[in-house]
């Protein structure tokens, strides 16, 4: 049985879906005002891997990941670029789709956009106002946190701790809010900003209400899994829970999952430190599969430390797996140990999707394969396990000229013409083909 570390309970829980054989997942997507950075990619890759493992286990997964296309940063960025907010968002949505495709990420079942759910957002806020979970103040609408009895549970803090932190922040809302923790459901329009008509005047939604509406509209009042980066625990996911459960009276999500951060040379990634790395830029020099494999080297909840050496190591290890995958099949080989590797892999992944341990099993399996255990069944299984990580190797086919040289070398060795055999080997090495003579014949790998 799959066990999930649930952030809400701070414990491993057996995964029991709402509907047998089906998984409904909502994962918070990007705010589309720039190219995604490597930290954003960690979340995308982590939850794509989780989705793929569910599917490997036979589940039907309804995977929803949104685009936040109404936001202060988008308004500011569009104005600076001399574009309308939709065209500006469209640009970075297209860039996002290209970047994650290069990382081998499967398309979501649906990628909802905020602008397509404005009527539903307004209706949601109206219900909260009618139930007195929200109040209007100067054209803004705020959620009344004092009525949410378990508000701080996901953040694992006391309400008093959060209030102290919120009261220390100075903003223009402080004088009109009943409580420093109250958060905006609807913001009144400022001059020149994109806005929509509402019962409270022209305005736009707050960030947190957007995800609650899209998640419940598509997946229903209660969903199986809600995921995102660890930075979203508070306030974003905390506020999602408060407003969603206030409206429906039901548990919003049964499992809360949060991935760890990506550090750069053991420092937090930030523009101020000059270590801000976008996937768009990284893909110019590093293959997408290498980036993805690097991100999978740690279990999703743990931080990943980005260094040039770590990425290089991922490239070397991936090349080893690729060369293993392209070894010649030996149908008469002994593959009785295969099921032991599969069982060990599944045990690793069932334990809260421990990709680090899962990859360790794959490398143990690769070592076993290289010792002469590569049947068609083994190759098919290796491909299935690698695909969970979004790694798909294409069958390598040698050019006819190279195949001819390998055959000529074999003939030279048979005739004990080792000078010719060595010359051909060196010539092939210059073309990136490395030969290995074994008791079962010659094997080749591509450097």
From Swiss-Prot:
The highest taxon in the source lineage is: Bacteria
List the catalysed reactions. tRNA(Cys) + L-cysteine + ATP = L-cysteinyl-tRNA(Cys) + AMP + diphosphate
Q: What class of enzyme is it?
A: ligase
Identify the SUPFAM superfamilies for this entry.
Anticodon-binding domain of a subclass of class I aminoacyl-tRNA synthetases, Nucleotidylyl transferase
Which residues does the annotation say bind Zn(2+)?
Answer: 28, 211, 236, 240
Q: Which UniProt keywords apply?
A: Aminoacyl-tRNA synthetase, ATP-binding, Cytoplasm, Ligase, Metal-binding, Nucleotide-binding, Protein biosynthesis, Zinc
Q: What are its E.C. numbers?
A: 6.1.1.16
Please name the Gene3D superfamilies in this protein's record.
Anticodon-binding domain of a subclass of class I aminoacyl-tRNA synthetases (1.20.120.640), HUPs (3.40.50.620)
Q: What is its main location?
A: cytoplasm
Q: Which Pfam families match?
A: CysS_C, DALR_2, tRNA-synt_1e
How is the subunit organization of this protein annotated in UniProt? Monomer.
Instruction: Please report the name of this protein according to its UniProt entry.
Output: Cysteine--tRNA ligase
Query: Which organism does this sequence originate in?
Result: Streptococcus agalactiae serotype III (strain NEM316)
Gene that codes for this? cysS
